[in-house]
Every structure is written in structure tokens, then in C-alpha cells.
Amino acid sequence: PTDERSLGAENYDGEGLATRRNDLIVSGSLNTFLHNSYTARRLGVISTGSAVRGVRSRPGVGMHAMQILPGDKTREELIRNVQNGIFVRGVNGLHSGVNPVSGDFSVGAYGHRIVEGSLGEPFREATIASTVQRMLLDIVEVGGDFEFLPGGTGMSSLVIAEIALSGS
């Protein structure tokens, strides 16, 4: 949350506590939960500096400048290792296609097919669906092409073993 390269970087959370790095997943296992003062007090732990709030709302729990740390391979190397798949260049409908309680998502996607390790024909108006939990479990590899996205989160290319696909 304090990475100055991110538009989402903040020194203090929505309750005025210092933000800090929280490693949520380490070596494929859940490492910690995020907390504001209220949730921390309820569970008898220390706040992780993760309070977020709107102008008229009470502080909730959320992330500031979330990042998936980069791996070693280039995007091209990741694609070369996929025999049959899709390369998603972008998604539509994140604001309405994700259930924040269950983790279910179904969003529009566009990109290219991957055939025998090379980018093939483009596709658009496809739908990808899964759960956030399943997608995290199905990550095979993380690319070294880290970049910040609008809103302050940071991301690298991911190779995901399975995801439901429908459409063109």
C-alpha cells in the first residue's frame, strides 16, 4: 500500500492507522486476513491497516494497491509453454460480474487464442467464469511483466490451468 509507483499508495488507512505490506498468500497458502480496527478487535488480533471508507460510510476492510509479485518468465515464454488456451487482453464488466461475498465471477473477455505455443486468431465477446478461490488455486505460473493497472493495483501475466469459457 505504500509503493510510491502505485496510484493507490497511501500512508494511512481509512481510520488513520499506518498502512503496511500484508502478504496474503505465501507459497500458495493463505497467510493472513486483512483487518480494520473493528474486525481486529472482534478476533483479538491487531489491525493490518486495511480500513477503507467512503465519504458517508463507516470504515470497511479493503486493499490498497494490491499486487501479485512477478515471476521470472516473459509473457512470450509463458505463451510458448501453453499448447491450447486463450490469452486474455482485457475484460469487461468487473463492476457487475463479480460477487464479493462468494468470489464467483463471470465477465466479458477479449484476446487471442493460443495454439501450440503461439498467439492465434483474435476473439471478442467471450465470457470467462470461475471463482476467485478456484482461479488462485489454478495459477500455474506468474510472469515477470509486472505493471500497474488503473486504480493502483499491480499485476503480472498469469498462466491459469482451467477457466470456463463461452462465446466466440
Indicate where each model-derived feature is located:
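N-terminal small-residue-enriched
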Residues: 1-168
